[in-house]
């Protein structure tokens, strides 16, 4: 019985959510996609495909309940410049969270529903964030199928 349960749970393993960043023009101008694993992605000083200081919007595919993330002006995800934080639910029926302004959560209390189970993380700092995105920080992300295979 235990073997069957483990096999069933393994077959239901999830892929990590993916966040897509968009430039000023919106959905038809994708800048980059990042797998949402715990840690930070510095747009300015790393080899990822994201442009520094060019993004205005984001969307998420494969959303998972409880993943938290912040979008920062500071390239090291420090809170000394403008930033906004979020927490995800499972998204719509297809586990997607539609296109959202990078600063949509600012000024909202923690847990405030923005749309599609996307909530405010309750922490932010004022100042221009749209067109100034330099870092993504993710925490509370579940282990994906790839992470489990590496262990």
Regions flagged by a language model, labelled:
Residues 1-9:
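Sec-dependent N-terminal signal peptides
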Residues 13-151:
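Compact beta-sheet-dominated domain cores in extracellular/mature segments
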